[in-house]
Regions:
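Solvent-exposed, non-transmembrane regions of membrane-associated and secreted proteins
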Residues: 15, 22-26, 32-259
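N-terminal intrinsically disordered, acidic low-complexity segments at the extreme N-terminus
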Residues: 2-21
């Protein structure tokens, strides 16, 4: 070690000497403090190791296995959605809705009919976000089993077309991680939600990181909007990231049986 390095080490020791002296003095007066600090240090180290081990396990095992499972579930959901798109238009309620003159009112009637058709875990539509290369089938419900199939519609929020805030939750890791790049959305990006009765086009307003307990983000506002939520940051559930988008237009409204 060179002379300058020895001098630097000596200066460092001198700088920390008062701190070390105060620590030693505190330990002498409070014998239990040293043990407490050691326990706290060990606990922090263990916590860090557990977090790193969980991330490693996710990358090495859960990601590929759950992605395979997610792919199978998406394939099943695609078939289920195709069946729904074929059967829903032929229902008696849709035939009656076809006679409604007002386009806006017709969308509302169709949406109300649809909401009574679906059940938890069932495929209900498709979410398409070109800017992050997302095209995924969404399901009804945000329980664990539903989210393993794809993004899930918050059942306490209305369907697109019923007015207010429509919200979906999705994974950012595992099970194909459909919302992995939610943080890359920018104001102006387009989101399409394709339902069996109409297609709803939204434009992103922005994103925000919130606490998991912040349910205010899915509350009703004065206009029709879409909210997408996911855990944040990656490999952690300590926070949530939410993307907000305002409804721009409604198209491809179901005309009736066969239309």
């Amino acid at each position: 070690m060179g002379g300058r390095s020895l001098i630097a080490v000596a200066k460092s020791r001198m700088r920390w000497a008062p701190v070390r002296a105060r620590y030693d003095e505190a330990v002498r007066h409070h014998p239990g403090m040293h043990r407490l600090l050691r326990v706290a240090s060990v606990a922090l180290i263990i916590a860090g190791v557990v977090i790193l081990a969980d991330v490693a396990a996710t990358l090495a095992w859960r990601e590929p296995v759950s992605s395979l499972y997610g792919s199978i579930q998406q394939h099943k959901a695609a078939s289920e959605l195709a069946d729904l798109e074929a059967s829903f238009p032929s229902s008696a309620g849709v035939r009656r809705a076809a006679t409604v003159k007002s386009r806006h009112r017709k969308v509302g009637v169709l949406t109300d009919l649809f909401s009574n058709w679906v059940h938890e875990g069932q495929a209900i539509g498709r979410i398409v976000i070109p800017s992050i290369d997302l095209d995924v089938i969404a399901v009804q419900g945000t329980d664990t089993a539903s989210l393993e199939k794809g993004p899930g519609h918050y059942p306490q929020t209305p369907f697109p077309g019923q007015g207010g805030t429509t919200a979906f939750a999705g994974h950012r890791t595992t099970y194909l991680a459909p919302f992995r790049h939610l943080d890359q959305l920018r104001a102006g990006d387009v989101i399409e939600v394709e339902m069996p009765y109409a297609t709803f086009t939204y434009r992103v307003q922005g994103t925000r990181v919130v606490a998991p307990s912040d349910i205010g983000i899915i509350h009703r506002v004065s206009y029709d909007r879409l909210v997408l939520t996911a855990c944040h940051p990656l490999y952690s559930a300590s926070e949530r990231i939410a993307a907000f988008a305002k409804l721009q237009r409604v198209s491809d409204v179901l005309a009736g049986p066969g239309g």
